[in-house]
């Protein structure tokens, strides 16, 4: 709790730091501190509370109650476990009226306005990496199902790309609705729209319904086998956010959810799932998800441990790299098995080799105690998905080229052997010798 100065008098009132707006002299300040010119010690503020600067402003004692420039450090912790701060240490004040600025903020571009919209942030438009990670298993399966020498079906790829974008947004909405009581206590998630009060639960329900409606329209473009198969994954989408409260393996459930496209992509193009090819691909994708989402979870492991949230990052602990190496090896094994069933060629296996090196570098250089490094390594998995997709496409094209070259070689050798055979030549000569006699008779 902090004390704030009201706009119409000099008396102090007590208000919570988390309140969104405070009117002073007619100026709304969001998540800032409105302070009297006397600094008072900050007796007790819960650890992890962060001051965010919405507008630069200072309190001037000679301004007649108007707002001049009070400044707060953005994302500055009020106190940590080892040191307690006072308001004098946190606030920079300048009482000179010459520093008062009437400069208006620069207008936002259309793209900025869209990205910063609370509904857009609810579905993580500003962070497209999740949509890519959801799309790549679909793309792998669609490309593997293409006939030898053919490109993957562009229309199917487009449908699955749109579906990945929409359903990832729906999954994020469901996740935020389940985790509303938790997100406000975690530094990385405390500014999400539902926690910050920018959207209500009713808004989120309405938006979720709209996203699921669009997702259903996309699903109805597929065959009935794929419609049933796709709809059966909705249960995983709903229960995943609950798993972090129940088990240390929520990343396993996320992997089962995110890689459903490895099954669905094949059925969308072929009418059913070829399990001998798709199941190893699906298992490989699940292992891949456990790898990258464990890295991601290490960003929040301190807050998660305090709140009782479970994850593979907490389960693996200091043995994380050993576990990640095991799951990476299983992923490579699944990719090799799927490639063998599909009779893939050297471009595919070359891509698998590059992915092996990429994952090895990720794990070797990973600093699990550095959130920035964890975020960088997590995002780099987009490259893993792209490399494998290109390897499948090039391998399929090369397979068609090899088959055509083999047929041409077989036809040529057969023709050569027929024309050079002595018995064939004698038979042809005998046939030509007796042909006029048959015509005369």
Curated annotation (Swiss-Prot):
Residues 408-424 have a biased composition (Low complexity). It comes from the Eukaryota. It is an enzyme of class 2 (transferase). Its cofactor is Mg(2+). Keywords: Isoprene biosynthesis, Membrane, Mitochondrion, Mitochondrion inner membrane, Transferase, Transit peptide, Transmembrane, Transmembrane helix, Ubiquinone biosynthesis. Pathway: Cofactor biosynthesis; ubiquinone biosynthesis. Residues 1-95 form a transit peptide. Disulfide bonds: none annotated. It catalyses: an all-trans-polyprenyl diphosphate + 4-hydroxybenzoate = a 4-hydroxy-3-(all-trans-polyprenyl)benzoate + diphosphate. It is found in: Mitochondrion inner membrane. One of its GO terms (biological process) is transcription by RNA polymerase I. Residues 405-441 are annotated as: Disordered. GO terms for cellular component: mitochondrial inner membrane; RNA polymerase I complex; RNA polymerase III complex. Signal peptide: none annotated. Catalyzes the prenylation of para-hydroxybenzoate (PHB) with an all-trans polyprenyl group. Mediates the second step in the final reaction sequence of coenzyme Q (CoQ) biosynthesis, which is the condensation of the polyisoprenoid side chain with PHB, generating the first membrane-bound Q intermediate. This is 4-hydroxybenzoate polyprenyltransferase, mitochondrial. It comes from Aedes aegypti.
């Amino acid at each position: 709790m902090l004390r704030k100065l009201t706009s119409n008098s000099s008396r102090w009132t007590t208000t919570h730091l988390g309140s969104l707006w405070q009117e002073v002299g007619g100026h709304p300040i969001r998540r800032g501190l409105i302070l009297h010119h006397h600094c008072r010690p900050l007796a007790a503020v819960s650890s992890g509370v962060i001051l965010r600067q919405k507008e630069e402003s200072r309190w001037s004692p000679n301004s007649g109650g108007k707002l001049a420039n009070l400044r707060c450090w953005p994302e500055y912790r009020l106190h940590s476990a080892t040191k307690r701060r006072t308001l004098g240490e946190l606030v920079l004040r300048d009482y000179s009226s010459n520093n008062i600025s009437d400069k208006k903020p620069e207008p936002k571009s259309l793209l900025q306005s869209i990205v910063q919209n609370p509904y857009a942030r609810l579905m993580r438009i500003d962070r497209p990496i999740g949509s890519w990670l959801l799309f790549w298993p679909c793309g792998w399966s669609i490309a593997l199902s293409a006939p030898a020498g053919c490109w993957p079906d562009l229309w199917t790829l487009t449908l699955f790309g749109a579906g990945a974008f929409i359903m990832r947004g729906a999954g994020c909405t469901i996740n935020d609705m389940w985790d509303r009581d938790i997100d406000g206590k975690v530094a990385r998630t405390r500014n999400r729209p539902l926690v910050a009060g920018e959207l209500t639960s009713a808004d989120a329900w309405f938006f979720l319904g709209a996203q699921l409606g669009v997702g259903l329209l996309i699903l109805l473009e597929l065959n009935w086998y794929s419609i049933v198969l796709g709809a059966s994954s909705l249960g995983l989408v709903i229960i995943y956010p609950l798993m972090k409260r129940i088990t240390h393996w929520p990343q396993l459930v996320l992997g089962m959810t995110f890689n459903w496209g490895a099954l669905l992509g094949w059925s969308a193009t072929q009418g059913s799932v070829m399990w001998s090819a798709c199941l190893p691909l699906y298992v490989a994708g699940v292992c891949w998800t456990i790898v990258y989402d464990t890295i991601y979870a290490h960003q929040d492991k301190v807050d998660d441990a305090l709140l009782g949230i479970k994850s593979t990052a907490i389960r693996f602990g200091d043995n994380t790299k050993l576990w990640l190496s095991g799951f990476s090896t299983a992923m490579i094994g699944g990719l090799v098995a799927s490639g063998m069933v599909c009779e893939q060629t050297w471009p595919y296996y070359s891509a698998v080799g590059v992915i092996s090196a990429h994952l090895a570098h990720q794990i070797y250089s990973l600093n699990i105690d550095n959130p920035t490094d964890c975020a960088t390594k997590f995002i780099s998995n987009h490259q893993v998905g792209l490399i494998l997709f290109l390897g499948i496409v090039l391998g399929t094209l090369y397979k068609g080229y090899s088959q055509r070259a083999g047929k041409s070689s077989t036809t040529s050798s057969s023709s050569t052997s027929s024309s050079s055979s002595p018995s064939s030549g004698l038979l042809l000569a005998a046939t030509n010798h007796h042909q006029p006699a048959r015509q005369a008779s």
